[in-house]
Structures are given as structure tokens and as C-alpha cells.
Amino acid sequence: MVMKQMKTELKPDRYREGATQDERLLERVEDLQAMGMDAWRIFRIMGEFVEGFEEMSEIGPAVSIFGSARASSDTPMYQECVETARLLGEAGFAIITGGGPGMMEAANRGAKEGGATSVGCNIELPFEQESNDFIDVSIDFRYFFVRKTMFVKYAEAFVIFPGGFGTMDELFESLTLIQTHKVRHFPLVLFGSEYWGGLLDWLRDTMVDEGKITREDLDMIFV
């Protein structure tokens, strides 16, 4: 009974209302017409890469800053993010963010205050994330993996403020890329020791102790 219910709930519906581009891409399909559509989708993906590369190619040295979209502008962490981005901007770095509200807005605001190029890589979401008002170069993406390529390819470092699943995704993908030598080692800074302390304890006391990662792997992270 449980398995039957799961099959019903998990059955993909490619044409259902509100399906995102990522959902449509990842759904398993069986009819040949839909499979043909998947083959043609590669051109849309390629187009996103081309647009991203063209827009980002002349921004110069940059730092990608991540953090929660839900952070309020009246919190100390928001103001610290503004200040961090401002100082990086004054040092000659463009600032790259996900282009949305919260910490992304704070970083783009700081970039503007520091006289730096402020880049927002926005993503299509079901709840329609809108770009913030502090962006010089705005690029819209349908696919997360294309967007994340821009964060890594054009950044000299990552600064990661407290955030949720999206922030964790960006953190652990960058750690994986560095660990597997898919990209050169670059500074990966976690801002806010109190917030990140529990995660770092778990990495050290569980993952290292059980041999899932090495103690040297933790040297990739600065707090």
C-alpha cells in the first residue's frame, strides 16, 4: 500500500502547471516525443552558458558572496555583510551574488558603496525571486548548475554568510570541487563562527573520525 502510494506521488508529470526548468530537465520520461524535447533543451542550456560567459568575462577579479535570502536588513549580520563587500570592493574586487534579497542584497549594496562592479546571478524559482536594487550586471538563469558555474569560474574567493539549503549547496559543491582538484584551491571563508561552529564540530567529530574525510580536508575552510 505504501509503495503504491509512493509511486502515485512520485509519478512525474512533465507538463504540470508550475514545473520549473530544472524539474522538467530531471524528470524521467518514457515517450519518444518528450525525449526529443530533452535533446533540444541542450541548446537552451548552452545559451545560458554563452550569455553568462559573455556577461562575466570582463568583470575582472571578483569574490562570490553567499548567504540567506531571508536575512532582514536590520540585523547585525546584514550590516556586516555590507561592510565586508564594501571593503572587498574598495580593494578592487567585483562582487558576485545570487542577485536576490537578504545577504545577497547586502553584498550587492556593499559593492556599490565600495565603488565595485556589483553582479547578480538571479535564478528562476516557483516563487519568483526578484533581483535586488544594487546590481550593475544582472543575469537570469533557469538552471542552478549553469548559475553555480559562474560563481566558481569568475571568483577568486568565496565568502559564505549564514544561510539555508542553497547556501549549504554552494558551500559543499565548492568543497567537493577543491577536494577533487576540479578547480584550483581558493580561499573559502565562513563568516560567523557561532553559526558555523556546530557544522564544523560535526565535520571534525563525525566525518573525520569515521574516515569519510581527512583532517587536512578541513584546512580548505577559514572561519
Where are these regions (language model features)?
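C-terminal functional extensions of proteins
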Residues: 191-223
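Short, solvent-exposed amphipathic alpha-helical segments in soluble enzyme
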Residues: 112, 173-178, 204-208
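Active-site/ligand-binding-proximal alpha/beta "capping" segment
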Residues: 142-194
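Glycine-rich beta-alpha loop segments
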Residues: 2-22, 27-121
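Structural motif
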Residues: 61-64, 93-94, 116-120, 136-138, ...
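Acidic/glycine-enriched connector segments
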Residues: 79, 102-161
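Solvent-exposed alpha-helices and their adjacent loops that cap or buttress functional pockets
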Residues: 56-58, 87-89, 111-112, 129-133, ...
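Short gly/pro/ser/thr-enriched loop/turn and capping motifs at secondary-structure boundaries
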Residues: 125-130, 167, 195-198
